[in-house]
């Protein structure tokens, strides 16, 4: 089984790969960030929010607090998904706000910031979204985004508006809830701009009451502040990748698969070329090149000077650019980002920075009333269903039908009996001990496998009768993916009004929760 870097980090392992242990908020808060020009940062964010159409008194108040010389930031971010994308995109923003609220002090304000990954150019990852209505019909909407172009450069299209509103209008739910979500979406679209701008307005609209600020790295005022970090990277373009590869080898040596690899010559930089395509920069020791042409360092520095939004960081540099710009106290991250972080400690040091605290993000599975009833009958949690849906249903049916042959207790009793027999045989003839033990292990494993097959057969029979497993999977494993990684958060607002948002913002930071809805 593949070892999880995120699980190891949560357990306090891998100290050589992370500067601060998980949860060490006191240490993170005690480290001042005197190198950040907070006034310039606040001015740039003000310009962005003004252009986005979200600059109001609440944002101004947060920008004033950000300009405080001792201010810190709890930052999170995500790709700019369609209609906010999977639910965890909203969950991450909420967690940043919850953690900032916990850490906030009058003499050291802490502001939550959401980094909108507008530079990302993988259209396939952001162009689709999934919703589930009251009739338990899964709605999958996919827009035709151009591939290879940063989503912050892709103008929102009128036909996309029509497709989104058509989906909302045929969603089976209470009219008042549909109208409220429709109003949110229309307001986000009305401001115009890019695909990423619509995402940013939706995220901000949901979480603005918490004081969350949104940040788009493609906004010229913000990109200008990031240019010095990118210029430093151009000065030694292969050193960062070399440090990432060295960390990858160290991870492999202790049994963990690295998340990031940098092939020979690959830098940590992308260039948006004249045709609008974002391409990886490579360096051969003398010149830079993409798949299309060669560049000198001087040419790239001129690009950075003339249009700093065209030179953007790859995954191995993006967090460093973020934390050079922001006075980061904590970075709210998912499991994949934690795995990246295990390889970036020395990349931060290359830029004269200290890697901030990585805060494992809040995780929520929403349980609608019919799901709560089914889970109660099955005597299972949502997580157990997501891990093994057929097994959960099969075990429940075996209990109901008194099918002891498929129970864990029966297997344990068999194993205990075989262990006793093995010991007795070994006492009669010690040379038989090894063979007897191997026979016991094989027999127990084989019976366990047969039990699994029997339970799955029971589950299939029940599913054919009542479709209960299919219904549970539709809620908890839509399209075979755990709920918060697939289902759009707007699903729950469409069916339950503002209740999910209220409950989300009442959770403790970093919660791992299964939350019932009424």
Swiss-Prot record:
Belongs to the BshC family. The gene is bshC. It is an enzyme of class 6 (ligase). Its EC number is 6.-.-.-. It comes from Deinococcus geothermalis (strain DSM 11300 / CIP 105573 / AG-3a). InterPro entries: Bacillithiol_biosynth_BshC (IPR011199), CC_BshC (IPR055399), Rossmann-like_BshC (IPR055398). This is Putative cysteine ligase BshC. Keywords: Coiled coil, Ligase. Disulfide bonds: none annotated. One of its GO terms (molecular function) is ligase activity. Residues 404-474 form a coiled coil. It comes from the Bacteria.
């Amino acid at each position: 089984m593949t070892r999880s870097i995120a699980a190891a980090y949560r357990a306090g392992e891998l100290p050589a790969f992370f500067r601060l242990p998980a949860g060490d908020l006191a240490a993170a808060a005690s480290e001042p960030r005197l190198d950040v020009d907070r006034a310039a940062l606040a001015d740039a964010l003000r310009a962005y929010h003004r252009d986005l159409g979200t600059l109001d008194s609440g944002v101004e108040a947060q920008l004033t607090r950000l300009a405080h010389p001792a201010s810190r930031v709890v930052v999170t971010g995500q790709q700019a998904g369609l209609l906010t994308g999977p639910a965890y995109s909203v969950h991450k923003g909420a967690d940043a706000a919850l953690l900032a609220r916990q850490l906030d002090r009058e003499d050291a304000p802490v502001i939550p910031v959401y980094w909108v990954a507008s530079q990302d150019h993988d259209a396939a990852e952001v162009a689709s979204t999934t919703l589930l209505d009251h009739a338990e019909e899964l709605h999958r909407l996919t827009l035709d985004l151009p591939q290879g172009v940063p989503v912050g450069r892709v103008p929102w299209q009128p036909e996309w508006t029509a497709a989104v509103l058509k989906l909302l209008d045929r969603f089976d739910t209470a009219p008042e809830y549909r109208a409220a979500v429709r109003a949110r979406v229309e307001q986000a679209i009305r401001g115009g701009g890019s695909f990423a701008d619509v995402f940013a307005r939706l995220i901000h609209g949901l979480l603005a009451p918490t004081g969350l600020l949104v940040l788009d790295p493609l906004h010229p005022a913000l990109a200008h502040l990031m240019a010095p970090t990118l210029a430093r990277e151009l000065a030694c373009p292969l050193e960062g990748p070399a440090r990432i590869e060295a960390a990858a080898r160290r991870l492999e040596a202790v049994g963990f698969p690295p998340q990031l690899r940098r092939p020979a010559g690959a830098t940590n930089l992308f260039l948006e070329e004249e045709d609008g395509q974002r391409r990886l920069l490579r360096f051969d020791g003398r010149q830079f090149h993409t798949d299309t042409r060669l560049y000198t360092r001087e040419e790239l520095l001129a690009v950075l000077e003339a249009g700093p939004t065209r030179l953007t960081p790859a995954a191995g540099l993006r967090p460093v650019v973020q934390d050079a710009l922001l006075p980061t106290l904590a970075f709210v991250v998912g499991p994949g980002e934690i795995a990246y972080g295990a390889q970036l400690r020395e990349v931060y040091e290359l830029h004269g920075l200290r890697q901030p605290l990585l805060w494992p993000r809040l995780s929520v599975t929403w349980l609608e009333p019919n799901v709560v009833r089914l889970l109660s009958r099955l005597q299972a949690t949502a997580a157990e269903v997501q891990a093994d849906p057929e097994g959960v249903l099969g075990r429940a049916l075996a209990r109901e039908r008194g099918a002891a042959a498929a129970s864990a207790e029966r297997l344990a009793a068999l194993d205990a009996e075989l262990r006793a027999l093995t010991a007795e045989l070994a006492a009669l003839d010690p040379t038989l001990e090894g063979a007897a033990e191997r026979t016991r292990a094989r027999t127990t494993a084989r019976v366990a496998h047969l039990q699994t097959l029997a339970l799955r057969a029971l589950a299939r029979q029940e599913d054919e009768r009542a479709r209960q497993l299919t219904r549970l999977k539709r809620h908890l494993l839509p399209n075979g993916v755990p709920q918060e990684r697939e289902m759009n958060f707007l699903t729950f607002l469409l069916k339950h009004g503002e209740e999910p948002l209220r409950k989300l913002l009442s959770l403790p930071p970093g919660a791992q929760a299964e939350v019932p809805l009424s």
